[in-house]
Amino acid sequence: MKNIKEAIELEKQYIQFRLEGKEPFSFANEIKKLGFANLNDYYNAKLDYQISELEFSIEETSPLEAAALIMSYMRQKKNGILLMDTHEVIAYCGSKDFNRDYCIENNIPIIDYYSNGGTMIASENEFNIGLVMPHLEGLTSTYILQKIKNILDKYYDKGEVVVDHNDILINGKKVCGATVYPTSEVFGFTAQFSFDDKSELISKICYPSKSGSNKEPGFIDKLTRKELREEILLWLTNKEA
Protein backbone atom coordinates (compact mmCIF):
# COMPACT_ATOMS: atom_id res chain seq x y z
CA MET A 1 0.00 0.00 0.00
CA LYS A 2 1.29 3.45 -0.92
CA ASN A 3 2.17 5.74 1.98
CA ILE A 4 1.97 9.19 0.40
CA LYS A 5 2.35 11.20 3.61
CA GLU A 6 5.55 9.41 4.58
CA ALA A 7 6.85 9.73 1.02
CA ILE A 8 6.28 13.51 1.04
CA GLU A 9 8.21 13.81 4.31
CA LEU A 10 10.97 11.68 2.82
CA GLU A 11 11.17 14.02 -0.18
CA LYS A 12 11.50 17.03 2.14
CA GLN A 13 14.33 15.28 3.97
CA TYR A 14 16.04 14.46 0.67
CA ILE A 15 15.84 18.09 -0.47
CA GLN A 16 17.16 19.31 2.90
CA PHE A 17 20.15 16.95 2.68
CA ARG A 18 21.03 18.36 -0.73
CA LEU A 19 20.69 21.97 0.48
CA GLU A 20 22.99 21.24 3.42
CA GLY A 21 25.56 19.56 1.20
CA LYS A 22 25.07 16.20 2.83
CA GLU A 23 25.33 12.98 0.87
CA PRO A 24 21.73 12.37 -0.24
CA PHE A 25 20.18 8.93 -0.14
CA SER A 26 18.59 7.41 -3.24
CA PHE A 27 15.10 8.88 -3.15
CA ALA A 28 14.03 6.73 -6.12
CA ASN A 29 14.96 3.57 -4.25
CA GLU A 30 13.50 4.63 -0.90
CA ILE A 31 10.03 5.44 -2.25
CA LYS A 32 9.78 1.94 -3.69
CA LYS A 33 9.83 0.73 -0.10
CA LEU A 34 6.75 2.91 0.46
CA GLY A 35 4.78 1.25 -2.33
CA PHE A 36 5.59 3.44 -5.34
CA ALA A 37 6.69 1.86 -8.61
CA ASN A 38 8.93 4.76 -9.61
CA LEU A 39 9.38 8.53 -9.31
CA ASN A 40 6.60 9.26 -11.81
CA ASP A 41 4.20 7.11 -9.79
CA TYR A 42 5.13 9.06 -6.66
CA TYR A 43 4.78 12.52 -8.21
CA ASN A 44 1.37 11.66 -9.66
CA ALA A 45 0.20 10.34 -6.29
CA LYS A 46 1.59 13.43 -4.58
CA LEU A 47 -0.39 15.73 -6.89
CA ASP A 48 -3.55 13.67 -6.36
CA TYR A 49 -3.07 13.99 -2.60
CA GLN A 50 -2.37 17.74 -2.71
CA ILE A 51 -5.53 18.40 -4.72
CA SER A 52 -7.58 16.18 -2.39
CA GLU A 53 -6.46 18.37 0.52
CA LEU A 54 -7.65 21.63 -1.09
CA GLU A 55 -10.84 23.38 0.01
CA PHE A 56 -12.80 24.77 -2.95
CA SER A 57 -15.50 27.41 -3.17
CA ILE A 58 -18.16 26.06 -5.55
CA GLU A 59 -20.10 28.63 -7.54
CA GLU A 60 -22.76 28.47 -10.23
CA THR A 61 -22.27 31.10 -12.91
CA SER A 62 -22.98 31.78 -16.56
CA PRO A 63 -20.49 31.43 -19.42
CA LEU A 64 -20.81 35.16 -20.10
CA GLU A 65 -19.59 35.98 -16.58
CA ALA A 66 -17.11 33.14 -16.16
CA ALA A 67 -13.97 34.74 -17.63
CA ALA A 68 -14.14 37.75 -15.31
CA LEU A 69 -14.98 35.53 -12.33
CA ILE A 70 -12.02 33.23 -12.99
CA MET A 71 -9.67 36.21 -13.19
CA SER A 72 -11.11 37.51 -9.90
CA TYR A 73 -10.47 34.16 -8.20
CA MET A 74 -6.94 34.10 -9.58
CA ARG A 75 -6.17 37.63 -8.35
CA GLN A 76 -7.41 36.66 -4.88
CA LYS A 77 -5.55 33.30 -5.05
CA LYS A 78 -8.85 31.72 -4.10
CA ASN A 79 -9.55 28.06 -4.85
CA GLY A 80 -12.69 27.76 -6.92
CA ILE A 81 -14.86 25.43 -8.96
CA LEU A 82 -17.13 27.35 -11.33
CA LEU A 83 -20.02 25.40 -12.85
CA MET A 84 -21.73 26.60 -16.00
CA ASP A 85 -24.58 25.16 -18.05
CA THR A 86 -24.90 26.82 -21.46
CA HIS A 87 -28.39 27.67 -22.72
CA GLU A 88 -27.45 29.70 -25.81
CA VAL A 89 -24.94 29.71 -28.64
CA ILE A 90 -21.68 31.48 -27.69
CA ALA A 91 -18.42 31.99 -29.61
CA TYR A 92 -15.26 31.87 -27.49
CA CYS A 93 -12.56 33.48 -29.62
CA GLY A 94 -8.82 33.05 -29.21
CA SER A 95 -6.09 34.30 -31.50
CA LYS A 96 -7.37 32.76 -34.74
CA ASP A 97 -9.73 34.44 -37.20
CA PHE A 98 -13.39 33.43 -37.35
CA ASN A 99 -16.63 34.60 -38.97
CA ARG A 100 -17.34 37.52 -36.67
CA ASP A 101 -19.93 38.97 -39.06
CA TYR A 102 -22.04 35.81 -38.85
CA CYS A 103 -22.01 36.01 -35.06
CA ILE A 104 -23.03 39.67 -35.07
CA GLU A 105 -25.79 39.13 -37.63
CA ASN A 106 -27.21 36.23 -35.60
CA ASN A 107 -26.82 37.88 -32.17
CA ILE A 108 -24.30 35.28 -31.02
CA PRO A 109 -22.29 36.58 -28.02
CA ILE A 110 -18.53 36.71 -28.58
CA ILE A 111 -16.21 36.14 -25.61
CA ASP A 112 -12.48 36.76 -25.90
CA TYR A 113 -10.67 34.24 -23.71
CA TYR A 114 -7.17 35.65 -24.41
CA SER A 115 -5.62 32.42 -25.64
CA ASN A 116 -3.42 31.38 -28.53
CA GLY A 117 -5.99 28.75 -29.44
CA GLY A 118 -8.78 28.85 -31.97
CA THR A 119 -12.48 29.61 -31.65
CA MET A 120 -14.70 27.34 -29.56
CA ILE A 121 -18.45 27.28 -30.11
CA ALA A 122 -20.90 26.54 -27.32
CA SER A 123 -24.44 25.43 -28.13
CA GLU A 124 -27.57 25.32 -26.00
CA ASN A 125 -26.71 21.97 -24.40
CA GLU A 126 -23.20 22.29 -23.00
CA PHE A 127 -21.45 22.04 -19.67
CA ASN A 128 -18.47 24.24 -18.84
CA ILE A 129 -16.26 24.11 -15.79
CA GLY A 130 -13.68 26.55 -14.47
CA LEU A 131 -11.03 25.61 -11.91
CA VAL A 132 -8.70 27.85 -9.92
CA MET A 133 -6.13 26.40 -7.52
CA PRO A 134 -2.46 26.75 -6.55
CA HIS A 135 -0.03 26.07 -9.40
CA LEU A 136 1.19 22.80 -7.92
CA GLU A 137 4.18 20.99 -9.36
CA GLY A 138 3.03 18.78 -12.23
CA LEU A 139 -0.39 20.43 -12.54
CA THR A 140 -1.22 20.82 -16.23
CA SER A 141 -4.21 20.80 -18.53
CA THR A 142 -3.27 17.25 -19.52
CA TYR A 143 -3.38 16.11 -15.88
CA ILE A 144 -6.92 17.44 -15.41
CA LEU A 145 -8.16 16.15 -18.75
CA GLN A 146 -6.72 12.73 -17.95
CA LYS A 147 -8.78 12.68 -14.74
CA ILE A 148 -11.90 13.55 -16.73
CA LYS A 149 -10.98 10.89 -19.30
CA ASN A 150 -10.89 8.38 -16.44
CA ILE A 151 -14.49 9.35 -15.67
CA LEU A 152 -15.60 8.99 -19.29
CA ASP A 153 -13.81 5.64 -19.56
CA LYS A 154 -16.44 4.21 -17.19
CA TYR A 155 -19.10 4.88 -19.84
CA TYR A 156 -17.19 4.15 -23.05
CA ASP A 157 -15.27 1.16 -24.35
CA LYS A 158 -11.51 0.92 -23.90
CA GLY A 159 -9.65 3.14 -26.34
CA GLU A 160 -12.65 5.25 -27.37
CA VAL A 161 -11.71 8.23 -25.16
CA VAL A 162 -8.37 9.94 -25.80
CA VAL A 163 -6.66 13.07 -24.44
CA ASP A 164 -5.13 15.04 -27.32
CA HIS A 165 -3.22 18.11 -26.08
CA ASN A 166 -5.97 20.41 -24.69
CA ASP A 167 -8.84 18.34 -26.07
CA ILE A 168 -10.70 15.14 -25.31
CA LEU A 169 -11.71 13.01 -28.28
CA ILE A 170 -14.26 10.21 -28.39
CA ASN A 171 -13.85 7.92 -31.39
CA GLY A 172 -11.61 10.55 -32.96
CA LYS A 173 -14.10 13.41 -32.58
CA LYS A 174 -13.59 16.40 -30.29
CA VAL A 175 -16.04 16.53 -27.38
CA CYS A 176 -14.09 18.79 -25.02
CA GLY A 177 -11.78 21.75 -25.45
CA ALA A 178 -9.77 23.24 -22.59
CA THR A 179 -7.89 26.47 -21.94
CA VAL A 180 -5.36 27.22 -19.20
CA TYR A 181 -4.50 30.50 -17.49
CA PRO A 182 -1.36 29.67 -15.50
CA THR A 183 0.75 32.07 -13.46
CA SER A 184 3.73 31.21 -11.28
CA GLU A 185 1.46 30.83 -8.24
CA VAL A 186 -2.07 30.19 -9.50
CA PHE A 187 -3.47 27.76 -12.06
CA GLY A 188 -6.65 28.64 -13.94
CA PHE A 189 -8.40 26.13 -16.18
CA THR A 190 -11.63 26.02 -18.18
CA ALA A 191 -13.16 23.19 -20.18
CA GLN A 192 -16.20 23.03 -22.43
CA PHE A 193 -18.08 19.75 -22.97
CA SER A 194 -20.42 19.17 -25.91
CA PHE A 195 -23.58 17.12 -25.55
CA ASP A 196 -25.14 17.64 -28.98
CA ASP A 197 -24.09 17.81 -32.63
CA LYS A 198 -22.98 21.33 -33.60
CA SER A 199 -21.06 20.49 -36.77
CA GLU A 200 -23.17 22.76 -38.98
CA LEU A 201 -22.90 25.69 -36.58
CA ILE A 202 -19.12 25.31 -36.31
CA SER A 203 -18.78 25.22 -40.10
CA LYS A 204 -20.52 28.61 -40.31
CA ILE A 205 -18.38 30.33 -37.67
CA CYS A 206 -14.96 28.67 -37.70
CA TYR A 207 -12.71 28.93 -40.74
CA PRO A 208 -10.90 25.77 -41.88
CA SER A 209 -7.35 25.48 -40.60
CA LYS A 210 -4.71 26.25 -43.24
CA SER A 211 -2.81 23.20 -42.05
CA GLY A 212 -5.92 21.05 -42.23
CA SER A 213 -5.62 20.27 -38.53
CA ASN A 214 -9.22 21.05 -37.54
CA LYS A 215 -10.68 18.25 -35.43
CA GLU A 216 -14.07 16.88 -36.35
CA PRO A 217 -16.62 17.92 -33.70
CA GLY A 218 -18.39 15.27 -31.69
CA PHE A 219 -20.48 15.07 -28.54
CA ILE A 220 -20.89 13.06 -25.35
CA ASP A 221 -23.85 10.71 -25.66
CA LYS A 222 -23.49 8.11 -22.90
CA LEU A 223 -24.01 10.39 -19.90
CA THR A 224 -25.80 13.68 -19.33
CA ARG A 225 -24.13 16.95 -18.46
CA LYS A 226 -25.66 16.66 -14.97
CA GLU A 227 -24.01 13.26 -14.54
CA LEU A 228 -20.65 14.56 -15.76
CA ARG A 229 -20.89 17.55 -13.43
CA GLU A 230 -21.55 15.24 -10.47
CA GLU A 231 -18.67 12.94 -11.41
CA ILE A 232 -16.18 15.82 -11.64
CA LEU A 233 -17.33 17.25 -8.31
CA LEU A 234 -16.95 13.85 -6.67
CA TRP A 235 -13.37 13.67 -7.94
CA LEU A 236 -12.46 17.17 -6.72
CA THR A 237 -14.37 17.38 -3.47
CA ASN A 238 -15.97 14.01 -2.67
CA LYS A 239 -19.24 15.94 -2.52
CA GLU A 240 -22.22 15.46 -4.80
CA ALA A 241 -23.60 18.39 -6.81
Which residue stretches match the model-derived regions?
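Short, conserved charged micro-motifs
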Residues: F98-R100, E137-S141
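A glycine-rich, hydrophobic loop/mini-helix early in the fold
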Residues: C103-M133
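Structural motif
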Residues: I170-N171
